[in-house]
Amino acid sequence: VVLPSGYVFYSDSIRLKKNVDLHIQKGATIKATSNIDGYIRPNKLINDPKTALIGNPVTGKPSFVFIYAYEADGCSISGEGTIDANGHAFVARKDQYYVTGDFYPRPTVMYVEKSNHISFRDFTVVDAPFWTLHPAGCDDVLIDKIRILNDLDVANSDGIDPDHCSNVRILGCHVTCADDCICLKASKGNSEYGP
């Protein structure tokens, strides 16, 4: 799937499929919706929308995700274009010194679950409202020369969070964020994938 240069594509959530490359050409931008109803909800433990809005996804699976893949071996995102996560739609400036993100929902930008032989190459992500790239239960993950440029006032806007993954290579990336640039995780929410 190719997003051609010179366009901004406004989108609800995207579900990556097996062996599909989402290629964002240089000069193309895909911008996440500000409408929370347009997001995929992978956290099957949350059935009550009110709980999803106040629940903290740090220890569980994300409540809302912009780009999602499940059992999508060989999927990838590539190209020199931009993913604009539209994070400021989900946080508010409390005062001149502090942006609050203590309320939810705050969607994860990319959550790839139980998928092997996957890659993320060359693109830029800006303005994440929460974690940026969260592979979980994956094997053979390549993250190569991506740039993550998040607002330094937005708490928990982690860069790259491999969670219960194996054989992960992170090469030549640039990450600017208000929390962990790279954090290896073994979260409770993804414990089904082992250590």
Language model features: what each stretch is:
Residues 1-195:
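Extracellular/periplasmic carbohydrate-active domains that bind, remodel
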